[in-house]
C-alpha cells in the first residue's frame, strides 16, 4: 500500500512564515483532553495525551482566515503526486512537554472512518524532533474494529523540519505519547483526484 516520505517539501520562505505564525504567542490553540478517543484500549497498552489543536479545514469546509498558511504544503503535495488534491480535514497539533513522560505511544488509529479509496493522510513536520510517528502494517476502515494488541510496526518516521510523510488513510498510525519539547505537526486528510501516478 502506498507510503512515501518527501524531504524539503516547501520553500524556506513559506516554511518560516508557517513556523513563525504557529509559534506566535497570539496564535489561537484549542485544548483537547485526548488526541485520540475513538479506539478501545482496554489493556492500557497506549496513552493518549492532551493536545492543543488549530483547525484549518473540517469536512471540506475551509477556514478562510488562515488556510493560506498551509496552501504551499498542499500545492507541493499536488506536484509530487502529479494530481489535484481536494482537502477534507487539516489541522495543526501541538504537543507540549509534560511532567507525565511515558514510553507508550499514542493510541493507534486512522483519521477518517469509512474513507473512500482515494483518501490519503499526511503529516508535515515543522521542526526536528526525537519522537517518531509510527506506521503500522495493518489497515482498517473503522477505528472501532482496531485490535491494538495485534498490530505490527511497518516503519517509524523521524520528524525532520520540512518533511512530509503520506499514506492511504486506511493505514493505522500513532504519534508519541509524550514529548521532550513542544512538537507541532500539520495533519492533513485529502483526496487525490487522479490515481494514475500513484504507485
Q: What kind of feature is each model-predicted range?
A:
Residues 67, 71-199:
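Catalytic core of non-heme Fe(II) oxygenases with the double-stranded beta-helix
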Residues 1-84:
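Non-heme Fe(II)/2-oxoglutarate
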Amino acid at each position: 500500500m502506498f507510503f512515501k516520505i518527501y524531504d524539503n517539501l516547501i520553500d524556506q520562505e513559506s516554511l518560516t512564515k508557517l513556523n513563525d505564525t504557529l509559534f506566535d504567542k497570539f496564535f489561537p490553540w484549542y485544548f483537547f483532553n485526548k488526541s485520540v478517543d475513538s479506539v478501545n484500549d482496554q489493556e492500557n497498552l497506549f496513552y493518549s495525551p492532551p493536545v492543543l489543536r488549530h483547525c484549518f479545514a473540517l469536512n471540506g469546509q475551509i477556514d478562510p482566515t488562515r488556510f493560506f498558511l498551509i496552501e504551499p504544503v498542499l500545492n507541493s503535495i499536488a506536484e509530487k503526486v502529479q494530481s489535484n488534491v481536494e482537502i477534507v480535514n487539516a489541522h495543526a497539533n501541538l504537543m507540549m512537554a509534560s511532567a507525565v513522560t511515558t514510553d507508550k505511544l499514542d493510541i493507534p488509529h486512522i483519521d477518517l472512518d469509512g474513507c473512500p479509496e482515494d483518501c490519503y493522510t499526511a503529516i508535515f513536520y515543522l521542526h526536528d524532533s526525537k519522537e517518531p510517528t509510527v506506521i503500522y502494517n495493518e489497515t482498517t476502515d473503522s477505528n472501532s474494529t482496531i485490535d491494538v494488541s495485534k498490530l505490527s510496526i511497518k516503519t517509524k518516521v523521524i520528524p525532520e523540519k520540512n518533511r512530509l510523510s503520506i499514506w492511504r488513510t486506511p493505514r493505522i498510525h500513532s504519534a508519541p505519547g509524550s514529548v521532550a519539547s513542544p512538537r507541532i505537526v500539520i495533519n492533513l486528510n485529502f483526496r487525490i483526484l487522479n490515481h494514475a501516478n500513484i504507485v
